[in-house]
């Protein structure tokens, strides 16, 4: 602990280290991903631009909970988080804390900012944070280091994660549309794998592990095999 996170030295008896675990700022990642695909020649269109995608040859729907009216069983799991700021604590990696009810973590960001998250509540409400959640998140930060008790609360965030009953992602072909959904808490982690499966399915006609076919008139996809 002293070598990895000096500011936490002496505060905890035991900890586990995962040297290859990475973290990112999802907002920055979205901007960079959009710039990347535009630089590769793709065009980005948005609903407010009046773009009509109904005439596209292939449509992939990855809108999360916004597709719930089309996908039976897709539910929302609410998540709440805080961004706090202090110059009194320095962390170089995410720190996860054991919690009796929810897995809490604190992720360092630039300029003394830390993201504290995240709750898991069976609800599709996405507009407010509860007092209980606020207390739990702040208590977790304070338990990690008392200096967080004097931190500035910069932002309060709430939204919902799309999930099916088993909390596993799925690729569904329905009404001519490919739906990639149900990534739950693991959107950025699983998105590359689902994108690969979708490409293999559309281009190579291979059936991915997570595929559910609801268009009965389609030709069957060949079962994907692992090398």
Spans of model-derived segments:
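A short, glycine/Asx- and small/polar-enriched loop/turn
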Residues: 5-12, 53-57, 163-168, 173-174
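Short, hydrophobic alpha-helical segments
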Residues: 40-44, 145, 198-206
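Short, histidine-centered active-site or binding-site loop motifs used for metal coordination
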Residues: 17, 119-122, 183
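C-terminal catalytic lobe of FAD-dependent flavoproteins
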Residues: 151-227
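A conserved short coil-to-beta-strand element within the FAD-binding core of flavoproteins
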Residues: 4, 22, 42-55
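Active-site substrate-recognition segment that forms the wall
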Residues: 63-175
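Flavin (FAD/FMN) cofactor-binding and adjacent substrate-gating region
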Residues: 1-35, 39, 163-164
